[in-house]
């Protein structure tokens, strides 16, 4: 998993509440568990004018010109600005996979669905909760200023505007540690590899029958 310390990126505004995981990545794309390749189908039903199919070449599909990610000013966005209850619905982990594969590193919203919020951290995405009034302001500034960027500092737990104003956010210390060091669940376990090996050696001496592999 990629480590996250600080990120500066263009902001794309997703101006709707209750964006669910089926909207983020529709159900027909959930057969794969590779974690990659979902970016072209992110927000598929909003992004394209036709119906998406698994393993389809998306390069020639008709685009919805009104959808935010199809607008030139937002095509390279890596910070998604969203509304309340982002990521609600089913618990599919494909949703953060698709956001990450598209190129997003940060999602900012007034609130997130709990399971989606947890899944983001497990997949290298940083979900940030800011006060709704602050989010409203960021929406206005994003729409008024082409190329609007935010700087997110996970060490300092701040979001900073181009004008230099910073907003603080909260994040659990353990999740912060994992993101700063690029640790997924396996990586966290491997941090204690020496302790685990020492325990296994101790158990071989105190309970050797547990390790008897003979026929």
From Swiss-Prot:
Keywords, alphabetical: Amino-acid biosynthesis, Branched-chain amino acid biosynthesis, Leucine biosynthesis, Lyase
SUPFAM superfamilies: LeuD/IlvD-like
CDD domains documented for this protein: IPMI_Swivel
GO CC annotations, alphabetized: 3-isopropylmalate dehydratase complex
Molecular function via GO: 3-isopropylmalate dehydratase activity
Pathways involved: Amino-acid biosynthesis; L-leucine biosynthesis; L-leucine from 3-methyl-2-oxobutanoate: step 2/4
Top-rank EC class of the record's enzyme: lyase
Family of this protein: Belongs to the LeuD family. LeuD type 1 subfamily.
UniProt protein name: 3-isopropylmalate dehydratase small subunit
Source organism of the structure: Marinobacter nauticus (strain ATCC 700491 / DSM 11845 / VT8) (Marinobacter aquaeolei)
């Amino acid at each position: 998993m990629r480590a996250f310390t600080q990120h500066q990126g263009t902001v794309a505004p997703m101006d709707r509440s209750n964006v669910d995981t089926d909207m983020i990545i529709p159900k027909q794309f959930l057969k794969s568990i590779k974690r990659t390749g979902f970016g072209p189908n992110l927000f598929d039903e909003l992004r394209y004018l036709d119906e998406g199919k698994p393993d389809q070449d998306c390069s020639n599909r008709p685009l919805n010109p009104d959808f935010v990610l199809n607008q030139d000013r937002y095509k390279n966005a890596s910070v998604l600005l969203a509304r309340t209850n982002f990521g609600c619905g089913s618990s599919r982990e494909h949703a953060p996979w698709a956001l990450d594969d598209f190129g997003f590193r940060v999602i900012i919203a007034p609130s997130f669905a709990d399971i989606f919020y947890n899944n983001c951290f497990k997949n290298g995405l940083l979900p940030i909760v800011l006060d709704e009034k602050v989010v409203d302001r960021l929406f206005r500034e994003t729409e008024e200023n082409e190329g609007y960027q935010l700087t997110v500092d996970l060490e300092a737990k701040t979001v900073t505007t181009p004008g230099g104003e910073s907003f603080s956010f909260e994040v659990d210390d353990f999740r912060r540690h994992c993101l700063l060091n690029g640790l997924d669940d396996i990586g966290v376990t491997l941090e204690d590899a020496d302790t685990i090996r020492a325990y296994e050696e101790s158990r071989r001496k105190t309970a050797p029958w547990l390790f008897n592999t003979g026929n």
